[in-house]
Amino acid sequence: MENIVVNRLPAKTWYWLNVNEASFEWDSNASVELEKTIITSNAIEPVIVDIAGDNDYIEKYIDIIAEDNKEVLVYINSRADKHIAVHTNINAGNNSKVKLVLLNYTGMDALLYNEVKGECKENARVEAVEVFLGKGDVYSDFRIDLSGDKSSLKMDIGYVGRDKQTIDMNVFANHLGKKTESEINVNGTLKDAARKVFKGTIDFKRGASDSVGNEQENVLLLGDDIVNKTIPLILCAEENVVGNHGATIGELDDDTLFYFESRGIEKEAAENILARASIERLTRLIDDTKIVDDIEKELEEVL
């Protein structure tokens, strides 16, 4: 067994917060590597990649290549009953668009590591939707280099954490080109004794003038033993840029609870309605009806 370190912050903060990085145990000797998948913009239909297996440790590598002036839509459906590591690389050419939907389902005592890294050339765009549902631990590491002028990233994340589950997320928008844009939206619910870490970094490198980055997280807390850590980070080496971050974290307030109760909806049902909303808002960004149905079924089990 070896200790795999992931989700590193680009600029370290106080060590006692225990958020500079994350780690998990992995048995490389027992790991089975699945056949690599290469997806290009020549695909006429959306591409669905299903990842699962019976082995104790599984790794999967995926390349997504959008050529100049092309678009590609990819769904990555990862179902972990034991240990799965998925590594996705994105290459978005000039004026291209990549839409990526990441579905993370984990069974009890399972572990899923989802790593995405990529580069956007001039006027390229990556739109990503990531959904976290299940019972096991999930580590997600997402980094896009906005190298080309006017390139952009939009990231929407929804999660429900429960029992003693760990959800550790790291999103890094690396602004390199001029007039680049990033938008990171995270909405989630924590129940029972779930543990969640979200690290969102917007880094304006020298030369990224006239660029804009925004990140926002909303967290609903529905348990007494929850551990929630939200670390928004804006780094700036360029003067003429705009970076904003915000977070709303709290329990169901009395006014909202009264609104539901006055309509005959009890507290637990009201909490579940709001928890579902953090995921269901993302289904409006997903065109595949079967994928949406699968999400709804998972929600029924979780809530």
Where in the sequence are the language-model features?
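Long, low-complexity, mixed-charge
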Residues: M1-I44
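Short cationic/low-complexity microdomains
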Residues: V19, D27, A208-S209, K267, ...
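Conserved beta-strand/loop scaffold segments within soluble protein domains that form the structured core
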Residues: W26-F258, S262-I265, I286, V292-L303
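Extended amphipathic alpha-helical segments enriched in small hydrophobics
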Residues: Y259-G264, A269-R281
